[in-house]
A protein has these predicted regions:
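Acidic, turn-prone loop/beta-hairpin segments
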Residues: 95, 184, 188, 194-200, ...
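N-terminal catalytic cores of NTP/NDP-binding nucleotidyl/phosphoryl-transfer enzymes
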Residues: 42-103, 234-241, 315-342, 346, ...
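Residue patterns forming the tRNA-binding/recognition surfaces of aminoacyl-tRNA synthetases
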Residues: 2-20, 26, 30-34, 106-243, ...
Length: 935
């Protein structure tokens, strides 16, 4: 007799292998036809708002793994919030203006951009940016990101530019924006100012020099002995800045010494705290201290410049430290922020002896026309020959480089537009207190950056950017930015785009009949600089979020760590400065960088990059999503083919668990779940464990701890289900009567588990969970179209076991672990084959073990151990039994012998009361109900 056909061995249409690269595009098509994003909004309309504001990626290249990580995390946020009952508008955006696009256009098309009409060049930049918006959008869609792809915001869009102009106008009106000559980061390769967020530091070798500035005028303060052959010794790592030296700064309260070099009769002024180090570097071994004075004593003395016909003034500054150098600080106001402020305090004129191209001007004398890096060895040689060089060293130091061209930059004073952050620093820091920061240290980092930052340089000497909406009166020369001009420019930009600024003359752009508010003049010219791209991204909360989406502030911003000095900060500053409000976000979350499998930065030159498109083709987008969802994203996230292979194995465990459930639910109607009172205790144990999973995952989603969700689901599948519960209930599912209460109890638990597990993992494993959802039987209240259109399952409180009952079950499973160990020994000794061939006898040697056996008396131990018989009251182990002590319970003795009775040909359980066909009572009853005909 073939009994297989009498078993409940059903098969669903859910394949064991995912085939994700082939299957996912069809699912994307289904989502598109469903209009999933808008359906999600309709589902939760009128419910509490969860607004994730998309910090815009830059539209200058294809998708990379950093993009993938960022967008996966955002999609997890949106999907999980929607499934927790929130209304979740999500408008994707792109940052379009800036030097990287200009550079790419020039290189790609070999353009002479300086000879091109500006509107024509800007149009080429626009097309380039739009191309990569399209490329990136397709990549994000392939990743499964649910968003309003039909209506993204773009910082180059006329509507956006019109609103950004208003942000500038509001800050100008409050007096926060001004034009001044101040040192800024300057890339002379690209001929533009840079923001702090556009700077990358690299270790560069350099020659550091100690230079003698001979005394010129001591203001009658020094004795003849002190001033004889006296020089002030300065130290610098930037030789090329020496032509710009105007002063030497000393700390007013530190002790300075005049040191006599007995080897050559020279005398040097250095800080006493640094004297030994300086003398050692200079090779001066025989020296004495002539005198000591506080730094303030030397104020306003004059020194001769070492190679130019001019003098340098001795000034005082609190920032002069005794950590390095000589205590006498080379001060060139055109090349340093502190230098600039100090010289300004002393009423000195600004000197900037380097032009936009990084070449020395005529002010530098014989070095005029040289690039700064070319002049270093020449100046060094000249100082050596003139006897001005006290010492030199070769060191490696961290030096700023341009984020785009990767070349060293300089600090250089140029006329720029600035935002006076000092005016509202306190308000910006106070706004941070109302934000939830994840990680928690984010608030300290942000506040420190705001407090320490200089005024924000918001102008760029570039063409592809939003024009700074300022006019200049040709008669009085004053800059003009009024409510009237801002309103007119905003209207023009909104209608025609910002190219109109370069297509029309100033007189055509100002309001009709407009006159200079200072002198009444009627003729104007336009500002030629454009706005910093960070001003663009810092305006998105107003230009997109508030205007187009109708809410403010956002629930959350999520971006990379670099955005503390980038988008997070610029958004905070514009919100406080322009709008007079608090932070534009209630929560601020950061993620780390994506790095290779060894933790190294990914670069094309190193060949260690991972292309998301390759991941999609080889593994599928869900594996990429699982990578993002399994990572501690607050630190750097490793990425490699080996990692994706391992994740694919983890994925298969989840998929196989789902397949097991689906295969055993093909004949189940979840509208008729087994009631709690009627459900088998083992099934209620599984539901209680499910409840624990749901509580843990709900808390994790609230804190955006997706790693916790992924690990919890994986552990639940592997530990609770696959290796325990699912293994135990196979007999009930396959062999009990199809409609029996015991089987329906197991099916009810299976459905509850699969339903909840699919929903709780759906924000992360979007494609696979939806595939499962489409295969599942559903209740009447479910939305069968897509899993994300349903709410997360709440814990099944009515089905939960008590704490005492759960303790008893945990005891049973600890006993099971000990029994399994002995079963393995018996199997290895060939005493038994399958575990169903075993009879297990348990013996307690101590009170704790006796109590454990007493606690599990109500539990069906043969079912739990998957054996035919279990006894706890035998006097001694059977003859020939395999006997071992327990591990979980050292006081336990486990004896395994051959099962008593006859092996049932249908379920393979051994029975001492078989029928005439050898069937156990359970299988005999099932076959009778099925009207099985025995031949």
């Amino acid at each position: 007799m073939e009994y297989k056909q009498t078993l409940n061995m059903n098969k669903s249409g859910f394949p064991m292998r995912g085939g994700l690269p082939m299957r996912e595009p069809d699912m994307l098509k289904h989502w598109q036809e469903l209009d999933l994003y808008n359906e999600l909004l309709k589902k939760n309309e009128g419910k509490p708002l969860f607004a994730l504001h998309d910090g815009p990626p830059f539209s200058n290249g294809a998708l990379h793994m950093g993009h993938a990580l960022n967008k996966c995390l955002k999609d997890f946020m949106v999907r999980s919030a929607a499934m927790r009952g929130y209304y979740t508008p999500y408008i994707p955006g792109w940052d379009n203006h800036g030097m990287p696009i200009e550079s790419a256009i020039i290189k790609q098309n070999k353009l002479n951009h300086k000879a091109m009409p500006i509107p024509e060049f800007r149009s080429a930049c626009h097309d380039f940016a739009q191309h990569y918006i399209d490329v990136q959008m397709e990549g994000f869609k392939r990743l499964g990101v649910v968003a309003d792809w039909e209506h993204p915001y773009k910082t180059m869009a006329p509507s956006f530019e019109a609103e950004e102009v208003k942000v500038f106008g509001a800050m100008y009106k409050k007096g926060y924006i001004y034009k001044g000559l101040k040192p800024v980061y300057w890339c002379y390769h690209d001929e533009t100012a840079l923001a702090e967020a556009e700077i990358e530091y690299q270790d560069d070798p350099c020659t550091t020099v100690y230079v003698k500035f001979p005394l010129h005028d001591d203001q009658g303060k020094l004795t003849d002995e002190e001033k004889k052959n006296l020089s002030f010794v300065i130290w610098t790592t930037t030789i090329w800045t020496l032509p710009g030296n105007l002063a030497i700064a000393l700390n007013p309260v530190e002790s300075y010494v005049i040191v006599r070099n007995h080897q050559n009769g020279e005398q040097y002024l250095v800080a006493e705290a640094l004297m030994e180090k300086v003398m050692k570097v200079g090779g001066v071994e025989d020296y004495t201290v002539v005198s000591r004075h506080e730094g303030a004593f030397f104020e306003n003395m004059l020194a001769d410049h070492p190679f130019l016909p001019k003098t340098s003034r001795l000034v005082l500054a609190d920032y002069v430290t005794m950590d390095s150098g000589t205590g006498c600080v080379h001060t060139a106001p055109g090349f340093g922020a502190d230098d600039y402020q100090t010289c300004r305090r002393y009423g000195m004129d600004m000197v900037v002896p380097v032009n936009d191209q990084g070449r020395h001007t005529d002010y530098a004398g014989k070095y005029a026309g040289m690039l700064v890096e070319e002049s270093n060895p020449v100046i060094l040689k000249d100082m050596q020959e003139a006897g001005s060089l006290f010492a030199s060293e070769q060191i490696v130091h961290s030096y700023p480089h341009c984020w785009r061209c990767k070349k060293p930059i300089i600090f250089r004073a140029t006329p720029q537009w600035f935002c006076s952050v000092d005016s509202f620093k306190d308000d910006a820091c106070a706004a941070c207190d109302d934000v939830r920061w994840l990680p928690a240290w984010g608030i300290d980092r942000m506040k420190a950056m705001i407090r320490e930052r200089a005024d924000w340089c918001i102008s760029r000497q570039r063409r592809w950017g939003l024009p700074i909406p300022v006019f200049y009166c040709k008669d009085c020369g004053k800059p003009i930015c009024t409510d009237e001009t801002i309103a007119k420019i905003s209207k023009l930009f909104g209608e025609f785009g910002s190219n109109i600024w370069f297509e029309k003359e100033a007189d055509e752009l100002v309001p009709e009949g407009f006159t200079c508010p200072y002198c009444g003049g009627k003729h104007f010219e336009k500002e030629t600089d454009t706005l910093d791209g960070w001003f663009d991204s810092g305006s998105t909360h107003f230009a997109s979020m508030q205007k187009d989406q109708g809410f403010w502030p956002a629930t959350v911003y999520l971006e990379g760590l670099d955005q503390y000095r980038g988008g997070f900060q610029s958004s905070l500053l514009t919100a406080v400065g322009a709008l007079g409000k608090g932070a534009p976000f209630k929560e601020c979350v950061t993620h780390g960088w994506t790095v290779d499998g060894e933790g190294k930065a990914m670069h094309k030159s190193l060949g260690n990059g991972v292309d998301p498109a390759d991941v999609f083709k080889k593994y599928g987008a869900d594996i990429c999503r699982l990578w993002a969802g399994s990572a501690d994203y607050h630190v750097d996230v490793r990425c490699s083919d080996a990692i994706f292979k391992q994740l694919s194995q983890n994925y298969l465990k989840f998929r196989n668990t789902a397949k097991y459930c689906l295969d055993n639910l093909t004949d189940f109607d979840p509208n008729h779940l087994t009631a709690p009172a009627d459900m088998e205790a083992l099934d209620r144990w599984a539901i209680t464990k499910l409840n624990e999973l749901l509580v843990r995952c709900e808390a994790a989603y609230k804190d955006y701890e997706f790693l916790t969700v992924s690990h919890a689901v994986n552990d639940f599948c592997v530990v609770t289900l696959s290796s325990l519960y699912l293994d135990i209930i196979k007999d009930r599912l396959y062999c009990d009567g199809k409609d029996s209460a015991s089987r329906r109890s197991a099916q009810s638990a299976l459905w509850m588990i699969l339903d909840a597990m699919t929903k709780v993992f759906a924000p992360i494993l979007a494609f696979t969970c939806d595939e499962i959802w489409l295969q599942m039987p559903h209740r009447a209240e479910d939305d069968p179209r897509n899993v994300v259109l349903n709410q997360m399952t709440k814990p099944y409180a009515d089905y939960a076991l008590s704490e005492a009952e759960m303790t008893a079950w945990e005891t049973a499973f600890r006993l099971r672990s000990d029994v399994n160990g002995v079963l393995e020994t018996a199997r290895a000794d060939k005493r038994i084959g399958k575990s169903l061939e075993a009879h297990v006898a348990l013996f307690a040697k101590d009170e704790d073990t006796k109590a454990a056996l007493e606690a599990v008396k109500a539990i069906d131990l043969p079912e739990i151990f998957i054996v035919s018989n279990v006894s706890t009251d035998e006097a001694a182990p059977a003859e020939g039994a395999v006997v071992e002590a327990g591990v979980s319970y050292p006081g336990l003795t486990v004896a395994v012998s051959e099962a008593k009775g006859t092996k049932c040909p249908r379920c393979w359980m051994h029975s001492e009361t078989p029928d005439e066909h050898g069937l156990c009572p359970r299988c005999a009853a099932v076959c009778k109900a099925l009207n099985v005909v025995f031949e």
